[in-house]
């Protein structure tokens, strides 16, 4: 008789894990504590809620995130199917309407005959075949039990969400529509700054007052979602080479590159909401209004949501995990998602896909499998389980963790495309060999 699987948490990783398990013909009990109990970062009860940006990053095969998406599509990923269906214009990136996207994921799982949804908080690791995908905001009780199980303290860092503005409140005479280097369709609103405007803004930003941290939080940040004020504290040049870099964003009205540019990205399908790209923040709300209104075109901006900041936790995976996403101590227990040390929406969902498929195999009496290291999913699983225990940090999908090609290709784009083509070939063969 085929065993059933518990999946704890219906975020990106948990939703994907449950979907993959169910599609293998295995019964799933999907536990989600919302809406009975909310986290500091979630705003609704839908599954797979995007709590930071609405962008799933690049969609091209010359980019590691684009390759990861394509690998997931090979396995009929619920996250990728829903993202593709509810995409909004974002140049060469894949961005989604966050409301309709998460609603689609929720409805698909509710309607799957092999999925049972249970709305309750789990405060200790269950017995039996289980995938824990409770994410960076794992409840205190469960986090305590996980720490007891792993025998190691969790590491802490922060994710920070950018403000969302009403497009109708922006001064369209001061901003212009363009994607960097004109890649894809012109999907970003760009607010150009002169040198004086930039330094006036910068000087106010570094003086702005931040919200008080909780006593369990410290000042560790992950580079991928660093607050804008923390970037500014490292110097003006850090901003000019980071989120405010003007390269490839010539102002069509002058034909010249501005001194600095703030980009705004469409946040919903209707196109009436925009978020400020790279402006995740922990500033007090009044300070956000004051300082961000100094950006040209945003003088009278209406904030639909101010930026917020919240704690994240992740395991020391090289010490705790195997490349199958099983734990070393208990082979019927899997972890998936950001708490394993993969960083990013797509990476989290991909780890859920990987863990879910292996949990389904065990439920069917089969051995778990390790994805080929030439694939991005396989490379990430290998990295998080073989990295230095002492210096382990979260990681995004990147070509640096994938084995090199045998042939030497100087052109970076051509090389990346060749790596992606090899990965897609490997993953299709791997799927045909191991999964129905």
Curated annotation (Swiss-Prot):
Q: Which family does it belong to?
A: Belongs to the MnmG family. TrmFO subfamily.
Question: Which amino acid positions bind FAD, per UniProt?
Answer: 9-14
Q: Name one GO molecular function term.
A: tRNA (uracil(54)-C5)-methyltransferase activity, 5,10-methylenetetrahydrofolate-dependent
Organism expressing this protein natively: Ligilactobacillus salivarius (strain UCC118)
The primary gene name is trmFO
Q: Which InterPro entries match?
A: FAD/NAD-bd_sf, MnmG-rel, MnmG_N, TrmFO
A GO cellular component annotated for this chain's UniProt record is: cytosol
Task: Name the major location.
Answer: cytoplasm
- Source lineage: Bacteria, Bacillati, Bacillota, Bacilli, Lactobacillales
- Per the UniProt entry, the Enzyme Commission number(s) are 2.1.1.74
Stated name of the protein: Methylenetetrahydrofolate--tRNA-(uracil-5-)-methyltransferase TrmFO
Q: What class of enzyme is it?
A: transferase
**What is this protein's function per UniProt?**
Catalyzes the folate-dependent formation of 5-methyl-uridine at position 54 (M-5-U54) in all tRNAs.
**Required co-factors:** FAD
